[in-house]
Amino acid sequence: MNIKSLIRTIPDYPKPGIQFRDITTLLKDASGLRQVVDALVERYAGAKVDKVVGIESRGFIVGAAVAYELGVGFVPVRKKGKLPGDVLGHDYALEYGTDRVEIHSDAISPDEHVLLLDDLIATGGTAEAAAILIEKLGGHVLECAFIIGLPDLGGERKLRVLGYKTFSLCQFEDSE
């Protein structure tokens, strides 16, 4: 089964000119969801992974399942103000302005090896911010993994230039 065929494209959402890649059609398909989780688990089963970090919100869905299968803990990275208690935050640039993601300050221990997971990478700003938070807590980013890569937007390339390894299960070009 090709997981790419289970991902719906919604044109002009959330604004004109955007091709929104909707994974809810993939997630509702039991075989498709299993294929995604199994592929990621297979990739990292032999690696030293201490934690899986998932980025809000769709990164939580697959990230928690992968963490469970790997037998490691799951850590959420959330938008500003969504985590209770002591948090560490990092601001990152948007097309117009900035946004912020946060992680609990005790979520990662020094020298832990962390798999960073999200549903999609576009420009890479959110993934970069999450990786920086992991490193500020003393963790090491093993790899930044995504269900979908959008190579035309340069996010994976940006992360690789910054020294992070990246992996996407499938990729969509702008024309698709």
UniProtKB/Swiss-Prot annotation:
- Compartment annotation: Cytoplasm
One GO cellular component term noted in the UniProt record for this chain: cytoplasm
The pathway it acts in is: Purine metabolism; AMP biosynthesis via salvage pathway; AMP from adenine: step 1/1
One Gene Ontology BP term is:
purine ribonucleoside salvage
Keywords attached to this Swiss-Prot or TrEMBL record, sorted alphabetically, are: Cytoplasm, Glycosyltransferase, Purine salvage, Transferase
Show the InterPro entries listed in the entry.
Answer: Ade_phspho_trans, Adenine_PRTase, PRibTrfase_dom, PRTase-like
Q: Does the keyword Nucleotide-binding apply?
A: no
GO molecular function terms attached to this record? adenine phosphoribosyltransferase activity
Q: Which reaction does it catalyse?
A: AMP + diphosphate = 5-phospho-alpha-D-ribose 1-diphosphate + adenine
SS bond partners? none
EC assignment? 2.4.2.7
Q: Which PANTHER family match?
A: ADENINE PHOSPHORIBOSYLTRANSFERASE, PHOSPHORIBOSYLTRANSFERASE DOMAIN-CONTAINING PROTEIN
Q: What is known about its subunit structure? A: Homodimer.
**HAMAP family given in the database record:** Aden_phosphoribosyltr
State the similarity comment.
Belongs to the purine/pyrimidine phosphoribosyltransferase family.
Query: What function is annotated for this protein?
Result: Catalyzes a salvage reaction resulting in the formation of AMP, that is energically less costly than de novo synthesis.
Q: What is this protein called?
A: Adenine phosphoribosyltransferase
Natural source organism: Methylobacillus flagellatus (strain ATCC 51484 / DSM 6875 / VKM B-1610 / KT)
